[in-house]
From Swiss-Prot:
Gene: yjcE
Protein family (similarity comment): Belongs to the monovalent cation:proton antiporter 1 (CPA1) transporter (TC 2.A.36) family.
Protein location: Cell inner membrane
Single GO MF annotation: potassium:proton antiporter activity
Residue stretches in coiled coil: none
Keywords per UniProt: Antiport, Cell inner membrane, Cell membrane, Ion transport, Membrane, Sodium, Sodium transport, Transmembrane, Transmembrane helix, Transport
Primary localization class, coarse: membrane
GO CC terms in record: plasma membrane
GO biological process, one term: potassium ion transmembrane transport
Record protein name field: Uncharacterized Na(+)/H(+) exchanger YjcE
Membrane topology classification: Multi-pass membrane protein
Transmembrane intervals: 1-21, 28-48, 50-70, 85-105, 106-126, 165-185, 187-207, 222-242, 278-298, 310-330, 361-381, 398-418
Length: 549
């Protein structure tokens, strides 16, 4: 019962956190607000204690969030920026683990080399969800954000695999060699991607089977879609490959396989709204859980530091700043090196980095905030070695990782708005132009289809449709489509006409809705009739509002 009440409290806090953020006299990013609320609830005054199980956390929260990110990731842009993404998600992770690992070993007393590599490994993954939370959607230029999102999708796996190697060496269950580690990583990565593809393909086949035998029942199909990331993750982990990459691959496969395109309309509409709600709750839970762990981490670490002769308490805090500064320096240096390398050796087909200014490199550097994967990874480090001794400096690893997470978020909140001032984010006029061209092209195809259908119906004696009525209806529909097709030639007039028509339609829909409630209040229609007609109006209004965004 206690677990049930804890889940209810956390869900309530997540739902109210957005409201609290908006009514605050000063602006606080939602992730920081949720972390602060979590820390406040875990303080002894309130005493909300939630036991953090890293393995359960990785299974419960990470697969659906990464699946959703993979689902939303534009596959074309991801493939176009493949060199940039893998340069950050693989090469930079290796550089970070080695470089920062040696730095921690040299400057932080009491942390041996292998645990230092473990800490560097958990600090290597970046968090695109936290980044969007602290700067807002659409604030970072698209050419930068696309690469950062792809990096965050991939470096979770490379960072956790590096952590796995470091812990295995520290536990004495593995002898590290560069060749062995490379082969193991390739096996884990490629196997995870293949597992995600296969599970997603099986999901598509099962949907077609269910539609054939059980009808288009959206509830069943959405539940199966919700289970898909968990199935991908668990199956991949069971066979010894990357569950994280499997969840990402499953999400990206959904967009390319045509599963959603062939799905029934009701399923697509409900799936989108359901996933939007789940993303909000799960993202909020992640940051709330991070906040709930902070008081315990702080108390445990300070108590352990007091009895550790090699550590001064003030050194723990200065080491956080030092490690974060080193992470930023390595990241900036790597991006700068990639820029110079691209301009020098890849002149025929340069990487995106080649066109970045120093300011854009700084944005990408400070955008490398740390988040949930880092916390889950460091807390998954075992308490004891196989011989029963305590894992070396574990409390320092946990404290430093948590500190770097918070410090990276705070620095991002301060620096990114400054760097993003007066920067060109996206060419909205170009996007509107593309949308108008696409709508005009589809309208022309639709006109041809209607003309063919009109000819077929006129020739079909079994339809028994009056020719005058057939011509009148088809002409009306074709006329609406023709205006859309001609709109690309007079863009300004077309935009004004569309906006005016949308305003008229919205006004009409809202008056219809008010009248339906009046008819139900006067008992002229039943509640069932009201709900059916309201559903139709809601779909039309959602379409009109979506077009305006």
């Amino acid at each position: 019962m206690e677990i049930f009440f804890t889940i209810l409290i956390m869900t309530l806090v997540v739902s109210l956190s957005g409201v609290v953020t908006r009514v605050m006299p000063f602006q606080i990013p939602l992730p920081l607000m949720q972390i602060a609320i979590g820390a406040l609830l875990a303080w002894p005054t309130f005493g909300l204690h939630v036991e953090f199980d890293p393995e359960l956390f990785l299974v419960l929260f990470i697969p659906p969030l990464l699946f959703a990110d993979g689902w939303k990731t534009p596959t074309r842009e991801f493939l176009e920026h493949g060199r940039e993404i893998f340069g950050l998600a693989l090469a930079l992770v290796v550089v970070t683990v080695v470089g920062i690992g040696f730095l921690i070993y040299w400057v932080v007393p009491g942390i041996p080399l292998i645990p230092a590599f473990a800490l560097a490994a958990v600090l290597s993954p970046t968090d695109a969800v936290a980044l969007s939370g602290i700067v807002g959607e659409g604030r970072i230029p698209k050419k930068i954000m696309g690469i950062l999102q792809g990096e965050a999708l991939m470096n979770d796996a490379s960072g956790l695999v590096s952590l796995k190697f470091a812990v295995a060496v520290a536990m004495g269950t593995m002898i590290f060699t560069v060749g062995g580690a490379t082969v193991e990583f390739m096996k884990v990565a490629i196997g995870g991607i293949l597992a995600g593809f296969v599970v997603s393909w099986l999901y598509g086949r099962s949907l077609r089977f269910l539609s054939r035998w059980g009808g288009d029942e959206p509830a069943t199909q959405i539940v199966l879609l919700f289970l898909l990331p968990f199935a991908s993750y668990l199956i991949a982990e069971h066979i010894g490959v990357s569950g994280i990459l499997a969840a990402v691959a499953a999400g990206m496969t959904i967009t390319r396989s045509g599963v959603m395109r062939r799905a029934p309309l009701a399923m697509r509409l409900r799936a989108n709204s359901t996933w939007a709600m789940l993303e909000f709750v799960f993202n909020g839970m992640v940051f709330l859980l991070l906040g709930l762990q902070l008081p315990g981490i702080l108390e445990t670490s300070l108590m352990a530091a007091e009895i550790d002769p090699n550590v001064e308490i003030w050194m723990l805090f200065t080491n956080i700043i030092l490690i974060y500064a080193a992470l930023m320096l390595v990241r900036f240096g790597w991006l700068w090196t990639m820029k110079k390398f691209s301009n020098r050796f890849l002149k025929k087909k340069p990487m995106e980095f080649g066109s970045w200014t120093t300011r854009e490199i700084l944005i990408a550097s400070f955008a490398g905030v740390r988040g949930a994967i880092t916390l889950a990874g460091v807390l998954s480090i075992p308490l004891l070695l196989p011989d029963g001794n305590v894992f070396p400096a574990r409390y320092e690893l946990v404290f430093l990782a948590a500190g770097v997470i918070l410090f990276s978020l705070f620095v991002g909140v301060v620096m990114l708005p400054i760097l993003l001032q007066h920067i060109e984010v996206a060419d909205h006029s170009q996007q509107l132009k593309e949308e108008r061209i696409a709508r005009a092209a589809t309208a022309e195809v639709a006109i041809v289809a209607i003309q063919k259908m009109e000819e077929r119906l006129a020739a079909d004696t079994e339809e028994n449709i009056d020719n005058q009525l057939l011509t009148e209806v088809s002409s009306r529909v074709i006329g609406n489509l023709r205006r859309r097709a001609d709109g690309r030639n007079d863009v300004e007039s077309s935009v004004q006409e569309e906006n005016l028509e949308r305003r008229f339609r919205l006004a009409a829909l809202r008056s219809e809705r008010a009248e339906l409630y009046h008819l139900r209040a006067t008992r002229e229609i039943s509640n069932e009739t009201l709900q059916k007609l309201l559903h139709d109006l809601d779909l039309l209004e959602a379409l009109l509002i979506e077009e305006n965004q």
